[in-house]
Amino acid sequence: MIFDRRRYRKDNYTYLLAEGADAALVDPGDPEIALALAAAHGVRPRFVLHTHGHADHTGGTARVKVALGATVLGHAADAGWFAPDEDVAGRAELALGALRVGVVPVPGHTPGSVVYLWRGRALTGDTLFWGGAGNCRHGGDPERLARSLTGPVAALDGALEVHPGHDYAELNLPFGLGLEPGNARSAARLAAVRAAKAAGQEPAPSTLEEERAVNPFLRSHVPTVRDAVRVRAPEASGDAVSVVVALRRLRDGV
């Protein structure tokens, strides 16, 4: 079993999943980085998975497909950005040779956003970040994002590791602390992220349980978050979806 990631474009991530000779690249936005990642592990991925269609995640797909002869999978709702060979819509699990990858639709950041589940990990694309959630400026819908975060994402196992499409932790965590200045776990996570950066290391992945303790977008039901949001956005009602929509608007204004 192989699981690895590489950073590109400053804060994007591409991922490699492999079971024996069967391998997949996830979001190969930079083809050279993605192909080098596969080569470093001595595998030839036959599959490319997309969490959503934005170009910073799909821009390397054409070259990777040609280089590897790979099959491209993604949600057809995002086909305006890229052309999947296979649509993952309506499929709870993908059988990719020996790889078994769960599929959770999470529309919002884009209409076709999905989370992939594999061996205790959630590859969340731009739906859920460490300490934050994706914006909806480029074809997204804040209410659909809110319903995804309070519905299918909230239902996922808390033990899952979170592997997002970008590392925005050092930007997101202070926003959450501004809403909950007494959140000791959020402060500790920010300190750990900054320490890793100072040491030239990648941040350790969080778990969904940890995100539920530090990420305001997963804490819309918590009174301290709800009240802090309503002070800043009085138009927000008390329900969780309304709070997440207001959070997205507040975060966009930072």
Which residues are covered by each model-predicted region?
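Conserved beta-strand hairpin/beta-sheet module of binuclear metal-dependent hydrolase folds
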Residues: M1-H41, V114-G131
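Divalent metal-coordination and catalytic microenvironments
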Residues: L17, D27, H52, V64, ...
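Active-site neighborhood of phospho(di)ester-bond hydrolases with catalytic His/Asp-centered motifs
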Residues: V26, R46-H54, T71-A76, V106-G108, ...
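Short active-site segment of divalent metal-dependent hydrolases/proteases
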Residues: A55, G112, F129-W130, G134, ...
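Accessory terminal helices/loops
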Residues: T150-E161, Y168-V254
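Active-site-adjacent loop/tail segments of enzyme domains
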Residues: G132-A159
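Core dinuclear metal-dependent hydrolase active-site scaffold
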Residues: L16-A18, E93-L117, P152-A155
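Active-site HxH/HxHxD metal-binding segment of metal-dependent hydrolases
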Residues: R9-K10, A23, D30-V103, A188, ...
